Amino acid sequence: MESLTLQPIARVDGTINLPGSKSVSNRALLLAALAHGKTVLTNLLDSDDVRHMLNALTALGVSYTLSADRTRCEIIGNGGPLHAKSALELFLGNAGTAMRPLAAALCLGSNDIVLTGEPRMKERPIGHLVDALRLGGAKITYLEQENYPPLRLQGGFTGGNVDVDGSVSSQFLTALLMTAPLAPEDTVIRIKGDLVSKPYIDITLNLMKTFGVEIENQHYQQFVVKGGQSYQSPGTYLVEGDASSASYFLAAAAIKGGTVKVTGIGRNSMQGDIRFADVLEKMGATICWGDDYISCMRGELNAIDMDMNHIPDAAMTIATAALFAKGTTTLRNIYNWRVKETDRLFAMATELRKVGAEVEEGHDFIRITPPEKLKFAEIATYNDHRMAMCFSLVALSDTAVTILDPKCTAKTFPDYFEQLARISQSG
């Protein structure tokens, strides 16, 4: 297996221009494909997840052109639901941001499409979404294990009253919201349980509005969507920088700044993960907000005890930043870490212990007490891009760290380690 050893980093300083947001990129691609008119997307993320979405759109007959660096995409909208001319199988890797929205959107009209992916994708639950789509008339068959991909979709979604469990993944609701306006009838979506990762729903609603569709949001408990609508291209659309990707550089500055400035997101960003900066501030770092940047300066970091449900992805970065904070850090209400690219609660606890931390792993929380001195370790990344990026922060100590399978960052940030090196100074 490939590995990368990061030598101790004495200081970080500089500016990072963030790659486009994964969440925004894949939503924008799908809406542009469903819309009337041509859409030009700029600052599109070039990563595995986005490539899986683009490949699926190609197979579904959507035509688009990409710039040489794959960050500008011109899409000719289909002007309505996507149809495959014949039976089709789409391979979506481990891209939840492609699997969930396509599983819903391809239930409009009549299709015969199989959605499948990597072995890990077949372990990521999709039953709550399928249950909701079936309530709206969709014909969906599980081809292997009940409640998990691969799925066979045979159309039939017409709208109506639909309940969806919000407690596992907000992507299920996102998928329904993006699909419902194109259904022939009105759809009323009721949320069962507590809705996790609410800010991701705001990204979805924001993008739908950009593409000309508004819905009625009743306190995130119920959503009323008029049927028979169509999406309209906004012409051009700039994809925000990825706020989850920003978290590693901001945390690095909090630990070993200097000052690091990330551009492409700012105080008005639609991504909930910008609230990560508030957590660093609470821990003792100095944060400065601009319209299109966030900067962070080093501070003496203290432990925190917080509910992290609103920033599940960026909260992982706090778990490794906790190695540099005084006291015991507790991150709560993060059960959905367990259904991501890997079981992130288990993975995080296991690898933090390797570098010497004392860790308590609960059903939906993690408690971390840092050691006096970090130990050298080889970090397993579980084919999870965020594990690789989080544990790069260990090098901000006087201990080197080896990251196994460093290329797994390609899911959202192919040149992450090059960018980190660019702002790093060794002792």
Curated annotation (Swiss-Prot):
GO CC, any one term: cytoplasm
Protein's UniProt keywords contain Nucleotide-binding: no
Gene Ontology MF term list: 3-phosphoshikimate 1-carboxyvinyltransferase activity
Positions annotated to bind phosphoenolpyruvate: K22, G96, R124, Q171, R344, R386, K411
Active site, per annotation: D313 (proton acceptor)
Localization (cell): Cytoplasm
Enzyme Commission numbers on file: 2.5.1.19
Catalytic activity field: 3-phosphoshikimate + phosphoenolpyruvate = 5-O-(1-carboxyvinyl)-3-phosphoshikimate + phosphate
Biological or metabolic pathway of the protein: Metabolic intermediate biosynthesis; chorismate biosynthesis; chorismate from D-erythrose 4-phosphate and phosphoenolpyruvate: step 6/7
Subunit relationships: Monomer.
Summary of the function given for this chain in its UniProt record: Catalyzes the transfer of the enolpyruvyl moiety of phosphoenolpyruvate (PEP) to the 5-hydroxyl of shikimate-3-phosphate (S3P) to produce enolpyruvyl shikimate-3-phosphate and inorganic phosphate.
Name of the protein in its database record: 3-phosphoshikimate 1-carboxyvinyltransferase
Gene source species: Escherichia coli O127:H6 (strain E2348/69 / EPEC)
Source species taxonomy: Bacteria, Pseudomonadati, Pseudomonadota, Gammaproteobacteria, Enterobacterales
Gene this chain is encoded by: aroA
